[in-house]
Amino acid sequence: MGSDDQSAGDRIQKGFQINYMILRDADSGKIIWQENKDFSAPDHEHEARVPVKILDMRAVSREINFSTIESMENFRLDQKVLFKGRIMEEWFFEMGFVGANTTNTWQSTIEAAPESQMMPAKVLNGNVTIQTSFYDNETLITKSVVRLYYI
């Protein structure tokens, strides 16, 4: 990554923030969890307390509302689910062009792993982190780490 890419990433990050996140049961649309917090801040590990029933759902709809001052040509994210630091799952999502000085909502559906691959909540609790890297094309904007606790 060249210095121009780095300065572009820094410029975008300064004007980028997550306003809220919502997780819904993808089948019923019912809200499972909502947090009005900027999870994009890269300087510390965030925490989320999510109802344990999320582990029983076939699919979860994730809604991210974010604001940006800078435009982005190809906004995308790479999301890794880690258990005790080891990658369990990895997903790639692409939103595309995002205009300058806008607030946007991005909704995507995440399907559950097969039941045979699921671990109980007591094993997962506090041991799972979600590492999300936000990009404009190949330029890293920010990286967020959220530790999950099941309640």
From Swiss-Prot:
Keyword Nucleus: yes
Localization in the cell: Nucleus; Cytoplasm
Main location: nucleus
Short name of one Pfam family: GMP_PDE_delta
Alphabetically ordered keywords of this record: cGMP, Cytoplasm, Nucleus
Record-stated family: Belongs to the PDE6D/unc-119 family.
Protein name: Probable cGMP 3',5'-cyclic phosphodiesterase subunit delta
Gene responsible for this protein: PrBP
